[in-house]
């Protein structure tokens, strides 16, 4: 099973193909990830590798977390993720994994991250509800959601009903994005299209589960 890496969204720009076509890309900085733990089926019940990215002062983490990193003899990180693996022999605690070890240009990836927080939003903005008539007898009900239930039966609002509330700041995954370029010297990935989050936010990049690179 392929693993992914942790990175930080830098922003968006564009690159040009040899034919002169402009391609919008998201730039992700992926500093070398460090293996903080290798979980085995014998000890943990399943096989997985735990990665950490970024850096964090040891004084800013709790003693149990600091001890976890010290056991692997690595610096404390500000991001952590776990990937299931088939073989535990390929990874050792303290191992450093770079972008060139996992990704190649032309393959497709899935990118996960936290979307931009929008605060409290109504149903028109949050769920794309249509607005009611601007005039013709309609007053003070232009952006209201309308009825949220039925009658005495069932006598309640169903779970999952689309209503106003906190919008954004939720985990989101964009699938099957093309990896345009891998810059191993500067630890950068250029990914075609938009990815979740604001510039500077943490993202998780992993090989696509639904789509393979051309020719495979």
UniProtKB/Swiss-Prot annotation:
Methylated by PrmB. Belongs to the universal ribosomal protein uL3 family. Part of the 50S ribosomal subunit. Forms a cluster with proteins L14 and L19. The modification N5-methylglutamine is found at residue 152. The lineage of its organism: Bacteria, Pseudomonadati, Pseudomonadota, Gammaproteobacteria, Legionellales. InterPro entries: Ribosomal_uL3, Ribosomal_uL3_bac/org-type, Ribosomal_uL3_CS, Transl_B-barrel_sf. The gene is rplC. This is Large ribosomal subunit protein uL3. Signal peptide: none annotated. GO terms for cellular component: cytosolic large ribosomal subunit. PANTHER family: 50S RIBOSOMAL PROTEIN L3, LARGE RIBOSOMAL SUBUNIT PROTEIN UL3C. Keywords: Methylation, Ribonucleoprotein, Ribosomal protein, RNA-binding, rRNA-binding. One of its GO terms (molecular function) is rRNA binding. One of the primary rRNA binding proteins, it binds directly near the 3'-end of the 23S rRNA, where it nucleates assembly of the 50S subunit. The keyword Ribonucleoprotein applies.
């Amino acid at each position: 099973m392929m693993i992914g890496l942790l990175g930080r969204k830098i922003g968006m720009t564009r690159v040009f193909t040899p034919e002169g076509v402009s391609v919008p890309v998201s730039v992700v900085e992926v500093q070398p990830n460090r293996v903080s733990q290798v979980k085995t089926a014998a000890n943990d019940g399943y096989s997985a590798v735990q990665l950490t990215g970024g850096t964090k002062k040891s004084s800013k983490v709790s003693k149990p977390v600091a001890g976890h990193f010290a056991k692997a003899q690595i610096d404390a990180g500000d991001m952590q993720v776990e990937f299931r693996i088939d073989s535990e022999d390929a990874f050792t605690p303290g191992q450093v994994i770079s972008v060139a070890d996992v990704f190649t240009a032309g393959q497709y990836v899935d990118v996960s991250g936290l979307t931009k927080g929008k605060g409290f939003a109504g149903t028109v903005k949050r769920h794309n509800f249509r607005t009611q008539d601007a005039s013709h007898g309609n007053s003070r009900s232009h952006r209201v959601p309308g009825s949220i239930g039925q009658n005495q039966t069932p006598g309640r609002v169903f779970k999952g009903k689309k209503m106003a509330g906190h919008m954004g700041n939720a985990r989101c995954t964009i699938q099957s994005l093309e990896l345009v370029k891998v810059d191993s010297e500067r630890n950068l990935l250029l990914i075609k299209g938009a990815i979740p989050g604001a510039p500077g936010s943490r993202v998780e990049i992993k090989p696509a589960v639904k789509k393979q690179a051309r020719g495979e």
